[in-house]
Design a protein with these regions (language model features):
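Short, charged N-terminal beta->alpha structural module
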Residues: 1-10
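A short beta-strand-loop structural module common to alpha/beta enzyme folds
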Residues: 11-21
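Short amphipathic alpha-helix with an adjacent loop that forms part of the alpha/beta core around
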Residues: 22-34, 127
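Cysteine-nucleophile active-site neighborhood
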Residues: 30-107, 112-114, 172
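Histidine-centered divalent metal-coordination motifs
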Residues: 70, 119, 159
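Catalytic beta-strand/loop cores that center a nucleophilic Ser/Cys/Thr
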Residues: 104-150
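Phosphate-binding/catalytic loops
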Residues: 150, 155-166
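Acyltransferase
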Residues: 163-199
Length: 199
């Protein structure tokens, strides 16, 4: 619910739906009533995540802005033909340096930033389908963010809602701007927590 709280602070009206609460058909009807969908983190694999894979298909058909976080990011990759497998290293509450490629999702975010990771699965880089571009990665080349080349579909492996993730509010605000809340990106800059680092 932290992600939900961040979205509300950025001006979004939200509704939380569990991935096993609705059928794919019911989900399609619900999506027709919203301006954007976020597939949140969770346990398990994308194929075990209820209607998450179906949601990606709906976004592909309807063009509704979609953001996948952690498991949601993996669901996007898998739905489009990518492979998700066990990560080389378990990352539970660990911070990594992430470098982005200048995509608009990262507007206002430093080219390299700290991101908090909680995952044991990862998208296999060599299997990322042509329809997706890799927009951020770790120093060792682990895929940290994806974007559909033609549709407003984004995924991040790390947790933008974690207090130790730099620029998390900004990234969510940028996505909300794509989903129809143009003021969210500007508001995000004023809400981003100031991290003090000891030297």
């Amino acid at each position: 619910y932290t992600l939900n709280g961040y979205l509300q602070q950025l001006g979004a009206s939200t509704r939380v739906i569990r991935n096993d609460e609705v059928t794919a058909g019911e989900l399609e009807q619900l999506v027709a009533e919203v301006d954007g969908v976020l597939i949140s983190p969770g346990p398990g694999t994308p194929t075990d995540a209820g209607v998450s894979i179906a949601m990606v298909g709906i976004a592909l058909r309807t063009g509704v802005p979609l953001l996948g976080v952690c498991l949601g990011h993996q669901a996007i990759a898998e739905a489009l033909g990518g492979v998700v497998t066990h990560a080389e290293e378990l990352m539970h509450g660990k911070v990594s340096r992430v470098r982005h490629q200048g995509d608009s999702f990262f507007a206002g975010v430093a080219p390299e930033f700290n991101a908090t990771r909680y995952h044991s699965l990862a998208v296999v880089r060599d299997t990322v389908p042509e329809s997706l571009s890799i927009t951020a990665e770790t120093e060792s080349g682990i895929v940290m963010a994806l974007r559909h080349r033609e549709l407003p579909i984004f995924g991040v492996q790390y947790h933008p809602e974690s207090v130790l993730t730099e620029g998390g509010y900004q990234q969510l605000g940028n996505w909300l701007a794509v989903a129809g809340l143009p003021n969210a990106a500007g508001l995000a800059a004023s809400l981003s927590p100031l991290l003090v680092q000891e030297w």
